[in-house]
Swiss-Prot record:
GO terms for cellular component: plasma membrane. Pathway: Cell wall biogenesis; peptidoglycan biosynthesis. Belongs to the glycosyltransferase 28 family. MurG subfamily. This is UDP-N-acetylglucosamine--N-acetylmuramyl-(pentapeptide) pyrophosphoryl-undecaprenol N-acetylglucosamine transferase. The lineage of its organism: Bacteria, Pseudomonadati, Chlamydiota, Chlamydiia, Parachlamydiales. The keyword Transport does not apply. Its main location: membrane. UDP-N-acetyl-alpha-D-glucosamine binds at residues 12-14, 125, 165, 197, 296. It catalyses: di-trans,octa-cis-undecaprenyl diphospho-N-acetyl-alpha-D-muramoyl-L-alanyl-D-glutamyl-meso-2,6-diaminopimeloyl-D-alanyl-D-alanine + UDP-N-acetyl-alpha-D-glucosamine = di-trans,octa-cis-undecaprenyl diphospho-[N-acetyl-alpha-D-glucosaminyl-(1->4)]-N-acetyl-alpha-D-muramoyl-L-alanyl-D-glutamyl-meso-2,6-diaminopimeloyl-D-alanyl-D-alanine + UDP + H(+). It is a peripheral membrane protein. It comes from the Bacteria.
Length: 376
């Protein structure tokens, strides 16, 4: 029997990319199932692929504001968005509604609760966002990526792997082809460097200060700078020091960058850690110091202390000599193999399920009129 899934996600790529990854997994596993995205801001969201996924927009505004006018606007848009979502749900008739966080998702999830449609939430970060924290107790299940998150949510939490977009799987990409895409050699170790949407400038500055250390070493670099100006400047910088480097402002095919890399330097966003784990790449994490609730620190602690996949350096201590020493530790063949093996072991734990399986199981329980039992 065909299933119908409504997915609500909005805001940043950290919410949208896993949501689209889940949609692709559900379509692949169930074939005839229908997917509908419902949230605010989807028509203009740069991360959402409107050419692939059907969607409908509802009203939404931030709810947590000390400004009385913004608060009033938030309440009005919430009520309006809930009513719009109720009409959409009654027409679409989803078996399960899946939420990925941000205020954009609150109206559809409240509507699902009112209409008694099972809710599954996904919390990507170690420190839950306000929306998921508030809605967790209403959900049948909450998929979490970091074990620590369970202590901060009231819902029925289950650790799951992060849903990744189509093509972001280790066994789907040839390493030689990935290196060729960047014009790099299979005979050198490849360092992937990027700062993400937040704080790329500090990492770019760090790499400038390290440029003279790469000369005459077996290290080649893939550097995603986050801006065209930075990319142009760093291309010249690396060339002056005779460093083999592929420098780009942006890269749509990050799965190829991950497949080409032996080690990486980056911020510690949840998606970064999920992708590093999927491609089994050890790395140096420099948490973005201004992230909400310092969640990137907790994300990095998970990758370093629990997964045993890398080294954490706080930004104020990320001096060239410290980072260089850490890179040398990472690329040591014995240490590198040990960390890659640790990442693989954690990723492939038999007790670790996927969000897709969680959603499909919830839809089966719904058809049997059974609520899930809370795991102890």
């Amino acid at each position: 029997m065909s299933k119908r899934f409504m997915i609500t996600a909005g805001g940043t790529g950290g919410h949208i990319f896993p949501a689209q990854g889940l949609a692709q997994e559900l379509i692949k596993k169930t074939y005839s199932s229908s997917i509908l995205f419902v949230a605010g801001g989807l028509s203009t969201n740069k991360y959402f692929d409107r050419s692939i996924f059907p969607f409908q927009e509802v009203s939404a505004s931030p709810l947590f504001s000390k400004n009385p006018f913004k608060l009033l606007k938030g309440v009005f848009n919430l009520l309006r968005g809930v009513w719009q979502s109720i009409r959409i749900i009654r027409k679409f008739k989803p078996d399960v509604v899946v939420g990925f966080g941000s205020y954009y998702t609150v109206p559809p999830l409240l509507a699902a609760k009112i209409l008694r449609i099972p809710i599954v939430l996904h919390e990507a970060n170690s420190i839950p966002g306000k929306a998921n924290k508030w809605l967790a107790s209403m959900a049948w299940r909450v998929g979490i990526h970091f074990p620590f998150t369970a202590t901060l949510l009231k819902g029925n939490t289950i650790e799951v792997g992060m849903p990744l977009r189509e093509g972001y799987q280790l066994d789907q990409i040839d390493k030689i082809e990935a290196l060729s895409y960047f014009g790099l050699s299979k005979n050198n170790s490849t360092l992937l460097v990027f700062g993400g949407s937040q704080g790329a400038l500090a990492i770019n500055r760090l790499m400038r200060n390290l440029a003279n250390t790469w000369k005459n070493t077996p290290i080649q670099i893939i550097h995603i700078t986050g801006s065209i100006q930075e990319a142009d400047e760093l291309k010249i910088f690396y060339a002056n020091y005779q460093v083999k480097a592929s420098v780009k402002a942006f890269e749509k095919n990050m799965h190829l960058a991950w497949r080409a890399a032996e080690v990486f330097i980056s911020r510690s966003g949840a998606s970064t850690i999920a992708e590093a784990m999927e491609f089994e790449v050890p790395g140096i994490l420099i948490p973005y110091p201004h992230a909400t609730d310092h969640h990137q620190d907790k994300n990095a602690d998970f990758f370093v202390d629990i997964v045993k996949g890398g080294i954490k350096i706080v930004e104020e201590k990320a001096k060239p000599e410290i980072v260089l020493k850490s890179i040398q530790l990472l690329i040591d063949p014995i240490a590198l193999d040990k960390r890659k093996s640790a990442i693989h072991s954690y990723k492939c734990r038999p007790d670790r399920t996927t969000l897709c399986e969680l959603v499909l199981d919830t839809s089966e329980l719904k058809s049997l009129h059974k609520a899930p039992q809370k795991r102890k």
